[in-house]
Amino acid sequence: MKILVLHVHGTYNHGSFMMGINFIYYFSKIYPNSIFEVELDSREDYLRLKKEVGGNIKIVRKERIQYKKDNIIENILSKKKFLFDRPKQIIEENYDAVVILGGDNISEYYSGWKVVIRLRELSILSRKIKVFLVGQTIGPFYSWRKIFARHCLKNIYIYLRDPLCAEYITKELKMNNFNVCADLAFLDLPFMREEVLSKYKLEKEKYITIIPSGSINQYTSSRKKYVSRWIEIIKDLIKKIQFAHYKIALLAHVLKEKEGDENVINEVFNTLSPKEKERVCKITEALLPSETRAILGGGLFSISGRMHGAISTFQKGKPSISLSYSVKYKGVIGMSLKRQDLIIEAKGNDLWETGKIKQMIDEKIDYLLSNYEKIKKEIKEQVSILKDKVIWQIKDIANKIENS
């Protein structure tokens, strides 16, 4: 069985990387002889993927077509490759299936025109090959693109990761060709590298992990205010009496991108005094998801500007205060995981300019500590339910491919 897997290309985004790891690993347990062609940016990404799924799984690197913006000619040629050459080439490869992993790349949150190209490609591919959208948050779409999306997605097998998205595509796109499942990252990763805690001198449950997202514009237009609020939040945590013997782990969950978390973390860390730095562990190395999950799961709780950083914390049975900028947080964490109580709606200039965001985080921390054991128990129970949904999803995909 030969399967093309898309949207895992950058393994330094631990969210999409974890989804790719888990799909490949758990699918291969059903069909051990499967060959996975995975679109990846580099050989380094290929080696990182191989290390996380294990050596016996057959993975072939498929080079990713990159958008080139150096000049008008290269820009036009790269768009031609995406619009015409790539769909044709994929069809000619005779794959048994094409699997496009989530989360929210089929929406207008990040780019309007790119989603039109993606939708067109999906439509072309689905006429010739079985196409699966897995672990997805689809939409929102606006204007004529709603009708366009409905047309392009009509022949595709869709597996959503939350009920809110199901409500949206039922009401707004008038579609019903989907199953409601859960995010692939809720499954256990194949490996858990807890030795990373010793490397950073982190003692279990004696630290708090913070992921300040590098996607600043999703929260506020003021970089200066965004960074200064994170500095205040961290300084305040260090001063709190109840955390006097705790460290702060500043963890990058998305790296080596224009909006990589390491950029904000370095800026924040460099403003701290030498004494404050003794209490803060800066983690901006290119770790593997099995290492970042060990860090997130080993702490008391996390505060995360990356949704999959929060998911990894929850997956290990610990609470995470999630700073939301889109509906995916409400759907995946609020509705699927039933932890709306740990979400802060953090998008808006006013929150960061006035400092209200710090007050909101303080209130959530107080609430979390007051209900800590109860919340942990509920998280473990709900994660177990979501794991079963993800396993069902992978088995259903395998059955549909086999019966083609």
Please describe what each predicted stretch is.
Residues M1-S404:
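Active-site anion-handling motifs in enzyme catalytic cores
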